[in-house]
Amino acid sequence: MKGKPTAAENAVTVVDISDPTAANTGVELLDLDAVQLQSLPLRVRRVMIRLESAAVVFHSTNLRVRTRTSVRSGFLAYVTFGPQAHGTINGLPVRPGLLLAAESEMENTLVAEGGWESITFLLPPEDILAHLTARQRAAEFHVPEGAEPLQADPESVRRLFDWGKLLVDTALFQPALFGEQMKERVNAQNELLETLLATLRVADGFESTRNDRTRQAQSVIVKTAEDYAMAQPGDRLYVTDLCKV
């Protein structure tokens, strides 16, 4: 019989997923549904690191998948993408310098191609505000409305991703650092806040092109059709039904 999990096991969770129906396993801060889009053996890895009140979540996939993800109440999400990541977020193609900010309970649709890596930073909004207020920078605080794509200097966004990836690599090799030493979790969270806020300071609202807007509109149409189909279990659906949605 397996004993009670150690502090290190609670702080660092690694989940390897081969079945998309298990996509929500071991990730209590996110609600996630996934669909595999290629008929080959799937290998998705998720690493979650719990800091004092924040969390860092790493995802990678070897195949094309589509997910619907939302952050549970009480957290804001900031998502960065690896240098080899190809795909879309809410229909918007992932590209260098792109950063996504999302409020809690806001569903986002993501299509990830094979070789994808992303890191999601989850933080309580009151912690961000407290961090800024202590440094007399409270005016910088902004709660995203829905899902906000942001654009910044690609090098700045890359540094944020690299910081998160280094944290993940450290947690994989030395999980006890985060589970047994509160000082390490506190230091990591403070460094996360400084690194994230430094990136947000140089970020602007994303200026979408006409092609971007077309892709985003198509994404909304697909999502609406899927929602309708899922609400009609067991019924035979026709294209004319979807046209009425």
Where are these regions (language model features)?
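Conserved short histidine dyad/triad with adjacent acidic residue
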Residues: 15-17, 37-70
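Conserved hydrophobic/aromatic beta-strand scaffold that supports enzyme active sites
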Residues: 48, 56-58, 76-78, 99-101, ...
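Glycine- and acidic-residue-biased ligand/ion/polar-headgroup-sensing regions
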Residues: 52-54, 60-89, 124-125
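A short beta-turn/loop motif at secondary-structure boundaries
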Residues: 47-51, 113, 245
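A short, structural micro-pattern
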Residues: 50, 71-73, 94, 115
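Alpha-helical bundle regulatory/interaction domains
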Residues: 1-30, 35-39, 86-239, 244
